[in-house]
């Protein structure tokens, strides 16, 4: 296989691996649609706002701000967000990896410190903040939490795209 073809070969099984638990838990996920959407909206807001706050506090320029603001969504979405504003896409990819790996490593401690024990809270937190890497980590222990995390990851990405395109131009003019 040449270049990234092996990744494309593994993408199909990876999608099925995430989709099967969604199918199994579909009735509960439908019942939780409103809290899932609200949690994803909050997660997307916190993800973008925390990235912007850190970058502005550090005095970074707009190109870096755009990249850091997209840290809590999946890499393809982060690259599109960053690219659409003229940011540094490779930095966006690195920030996404840091957020994902950080969440996958630290989630147990964070959940314990903040007393997060519900499947909904754990899934929403990981899907919104640590995207696919965090979702895969949760899936090891609980298909339900992994399913919630998958929905949160997708919804947060859609909301983050909308949020960044509606707010970043205004925020950076100030």
Protein language model features and the residues they cover:
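Helical membrane-embedded segments and adjacent short helical loop/helix-boundary regions
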Residues: 1-21, 31-39, 43
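Helix-loop-helix hairpins and the membrane-proximal interhelical loops
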Residues: 21-24, 28-33, 56-57, 80-95
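Membrane-embedded helical hairpins/re-entrant loop segments and their flanking transmembrane helices
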Residues: 25, 60, 108-121
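Hydrophobic, well-structured mid-protein blocks that either form specific transmembrane helices
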Residues: 29-81
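Conserved small/polar residues in nucleotide/adenosyl-binding loops
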Residues: 164-170
């Amino acid at each position: 296989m040449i270049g990234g073809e092996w990744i494309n070969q593994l993408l199909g099984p990876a999608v099925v691996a995430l989709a099967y638990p969604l199918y199994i838990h579909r009735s509960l996920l439908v019942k939780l649609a409103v809290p899932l959407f609200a949690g994803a909206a909050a997660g997307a807001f916190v993800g973008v706002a925390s990235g912007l706050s850190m970058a502005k506090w550090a005095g970074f320029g707009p190109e870096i701000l755009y990249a850091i603001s997209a840290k809590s969504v999946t890499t393809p979405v982060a690259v599109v967000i960053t690219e659409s504003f003229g940011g540094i896409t490779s930095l966006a990819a690195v920030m996404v990896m840091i957020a994902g790996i950080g969440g996958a490593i630290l989630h147990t401690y964070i959940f314990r410190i903040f007393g997060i024990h519900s499947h909904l809270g754990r899934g929403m937190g990981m899907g919104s903040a640590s995207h696919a890497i965090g979702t895969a980590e949760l899936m090891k222990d609980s298909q339900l939490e992994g399913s919630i995390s998958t929905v949160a990851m997708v919804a947060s990405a859609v909301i983050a795209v909308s949020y960044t395109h509606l707010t970043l131009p205004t925020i950076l003019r100030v």
